Amino acid sequence: MSVTLALPSKGRLKEQTLAVLDKAGYKVILPDDSRNYRARVEGETDLDILFLSASEIARELGYGSVDLGVTGEDLVRETLAHSEERVAIEAELGFGHADVVVAVPEVWRDVTSMADLDDVAADFRQRHGRRLRIATKYWRLTQQFFSQKHGIQVYRIVESLGATEGAPAAGSADMIVDITSTGSTLRANRLKVLEDGVILRSQACLVSARRARENARVTEVATRIRKGLGG
């Protein structure tokens, strides 16, 4: 039975993923036509390569339409409800590092923790007659972190369609949940990360669809990639 491995379709993630596979002895033969999103692996007739966006990879793993994929853990946890039941993290690949964080305006000087934010949320309701607005593309992770982990219920998620970090300055939100690598963009927008506001430390991972793990070939490919990382 053939194995389908989904890889990021462009940019540095694609380059770094191909380097990881090469180190594991899987030389990917790229198609001549850049519009062709399928590739093959030299000497591996039963291993199919499919190029997708990182978010598509997370979704297709959840559907079980691909067996293995390389994508960010943040996308896996955000895209898939009950992700632990649907996919498994086979290996952390050591690149694509970024944190999903809770960030508030720097002028909120007395707000440094999630406990402080709980007080702010209640104060917003009492003083302004509305809920605290949080701009984010990570609504699932935000709800889990705020409501389930910290018991904060009085807030409203504002869907972010553009640059999330600009939402507070634009007046469309009071604070944000976003992904950051260095924090420089947050600082440029006069935002600060709460002391206990790191929701997830993410990086690129090799991920398997749970039901695909019954295929011994899937396990073999994942094991070989892990061993390549150790080399």
Swiss-Prot record:
GO molecular-function term, one example from the UniProt record: ATP binding
Biological process annotations from GO: L-histidine biosynthetic process
Catalytic reaction annotation: 1-(5-phospho-beta-D-ribosyl)-ATP + diphosphate = 5-phospho-alpha-D-ribose 1-diphosphate + ATP
Keyword list, A-Z: Amino-acid biosynthesis, ATP-binding, Cytoplasm, Glycosyltransferase, Histidine biosynthesis, Nucleotide-binding, Transferase
A matching Pfam family: HisG
PROSITE patterns from the UniProt entry: ATP_P_PHORIBOSYLTR (PS01316)
Gene Ontology CC, one term: cytoplasm
Key word Nucleotide-binding present: yes
Disulfide bridges in this chain: none
Pathway: Amino-acid biosynthesis; L-histidine biosynthesis; L-histidine from 5-phospho-alpha-D-ribose 1-diphosphate: step 1/9
Signal peptide (UniProt feature, chain positions): none
Enzyme Commission code: 2.4.2.17
General function of this protein: Catalyzes the condensation of ATP and 5-phosphoribose 1-diphosphate to form N'-(5'-phosphoribosyl)-ATP (PR-ATP). Has a crucial role in the pathway because the rate of histidine biosynthesis seems to be controlled primarily by regulation of HisG enzymatic activity.
Family the entry assigns: Belongs to the ATP phosphoribosyltransferase family. Short subfamily.
Record text on subunit structure and interactions: Heteromultimer composed of HisG and HisZ subunits.
Domain notes: Lacks the C-terminal regulatory region which is replaced by HisZ.
UniProt cross-references to HAMAP family, sorted A to Z: HisG_Short (MF_01018)
Protein's name according to its UniProt entry: ATP phosphoribosyltransferase
Species for this entry: Brucella anthropi (strain ATCC 49188 / DSM 6882 / CCUG 24695 / JCM 21032 / LMG 3331 / NBRC 15819 / NCTC 12168 / Alc 37) (Ochrobactrum anthropi)
Gene name per UniProt: hisG
